């Protein structure tokens, strides 16, 4: 698949404006195709970014703690089914084996995956598996809680529904006590 030119993308926006009954040549919409293309470049900037590159700076220290938990990483993504936003928080825990990363690196991983067309279930797995693959901890737990515009703006019109997804690797997948501890900790905030 070849990537369309910027002009082709702008023409596609004009076509969508016509489809909804708007006139793309009216004053308020003249620059809209450019704005949409610029917005999409930022919103979907997660494509082509390498998680391994983000996680390449590791600290190999004796860990004086058992678990590492980072809560409330805020994100906004777009569902691949309707291209409508969903937003929420990500909680990440891992049990280090011999290395850790700075906490901003975990937030950057969330941003990489959130800035793509997504489904929440897949994003949860991608975050957990990328931490597992790159840090090789004893285990990883990821929980995402999100509100989906495709549920609130259309269809069933449920604006208070929150979807929760979890994915576990290593000792979190193998031992219930670790999962239980993680879920209890994330519920306390």
From Swiss-Prot:
Coiled-coil stretches noted in the UniProt entry, renumbered to this chain: none
One GO cellular component term: cytoplasm
Reaction equations catalysed: GTP + H2O = 7,8-dihydroneopterin 3'-triphosphate + formate + H(+)
Family annotation (InterPro entries): GTP-CH-I_C/QueF, GTP-CH-I_N, GTP_CycHdrlase_I, GTP_CycHdrlase_I_CS, GTP_CycHdrlase_I_dom
Enzyme Commission number, as recorded: 3.5.4.16
Stated family: Belongs to the GTP cyclohydrolase I family.
Assembly information from the UniProt record: Homomer.
Name this polypeptide is given: GTP cyclohydrolase 1
